[in-house]
Amino acid sequence: MMGALSVALGVLAPATATADPSSNVQPSAIDRLMFSQREAERVMGVGLPNVQRQSATFALDTDRPDCGSVVLASVSSYDRSPYMAAHSQALWDHPGWYTLVDQSVAVFSTDEEARGFTRSEADRWRTCENQTINVSELAVDGSVLQATVDVRDITQVDNVLAVSYARNDSAYAFCQHVLLSERNVAIDIRTCSTVSKSDGERAFELMKIVGPRVWEV
């Protein structure tokens, strides 16, 4: 995981910052920080014709609220923070999905608020490191999924926080969850696949696409 993080950091660091580093990203720029359907399909290697977008994070309940958003960018976790605006999107291949991708972007008033949020999340994620938790997630089709999640090691290098986990509800899925804090923005991406571990752990690849955009808005 450390090697992948180092690669990700190298790609995310802007060669030339086109935005004024002393200025803040505005809430109106959120949509420019979201990956496109085509970008997600290219990274995941499958068609993702189903798309859901919303001006909020995701609904998720867990028996371990002290673990924050280790599974998914959740309303209960993000609403503890003073973010100004948040958008989320979920893309999947078909009902019941073999491949699922979701992303949340939150804009804060200051860089320090964004960093403070991700620092708090890092502490919460580590609370559940190498443990099993139970979650109740509002699925993309509106149903409620009960799942058991086996959380793996939590890894952090600079402003990139990552975890891989196995999720078991009606099917067994491999997932990767990555959180980036850059400027006054937090970007949260999760990828899941029921096909293989390598297919499920591609959140880094999507973060390499959208992370540098924080310096372009």
Model-based region annotation:
Residues 18-92:
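N-terminal "mature-domain start" segment
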Residues 100-102, 170-177:
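Short, surface-exposed coil-to-beta transition loops
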Residues 1-19:
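Secretory targeting and sorting signals
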Residues 87-119:
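A short acidic-to-branched-hydrophobic micro-motif
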Residues 47-49, 55-62, 125-172, 216:
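Short Gly/Thr-rich strand-loop-strand
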Residues 190-217:
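Surface-exposed amphipathic alpha-helical segments
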Residues 101-104, 180, 184-193:
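Short, well-ordered beta-strand elements
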Residues 86-93, 174-182:
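Short, surface-exposed beta-strand/loop micro-motifs that present aromatic residues
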